[in-house]
Amino acid sequence: PRHRYVDFNQGVDARLFTEENVKQLSRIAIRPLRIAFDNIKTEAQYTRAIEMSSKVGLKDFSNYLLYNFDDHPDDLYHRLRINVELCDRLNVSIYSFPMKYHPIRRTEDMDEDYSHNRDYIGKYWNRKYIRAIQAVLNSTKGKIGKGTSFFMKAFGENIEEYHKLLEMPETMIIYRYFFEWLGLENGGKKTAIEILGNDSICNAR
């Protein structure tokens, strides 16, 4: 027989999870369960929602991680790492899809109308950081799944390595294994610039 699954294509709100709600969700052939994790401030509620879901037998999860909004670049790293660690601890599968925020209409605090371009930069972000994240996602096909070693290779073993990655030339991020083979990834920034050209590295502003 053909197995069919229910997929709510919008993330449910982790703050509204109760034992009864999760019990009812577990009665549905839902795969994956999408739980919103757009703000690091909801970490406790989000983690609790994943734990509660795991206890009733739900094992497949997915979410979009909004960035370039009111968040700090470090927040994206922490949210991704939380998901990877939850996968390991609970033996579940969480696919994360970082999604760049872009306004669809102009508000009073904006200096221009961004509805017809992709130029919006969040308060704590800059163009270089956004391009670096997009370069990583280009290498991972837009998603981050389970696997600590994979995550650490993509985004860094700690926040300091993540910061270094944000400053890397995009070509060096996408073809990192090649540059490692050349021995240029660590301590070879000057040489990399000479190879790639000064235009590959832009000011972090």
Residue ranges and their predicted role:
Residues 22-25, 46-54, 76-84:
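Generic structural signal for well-ordered alpha-helices
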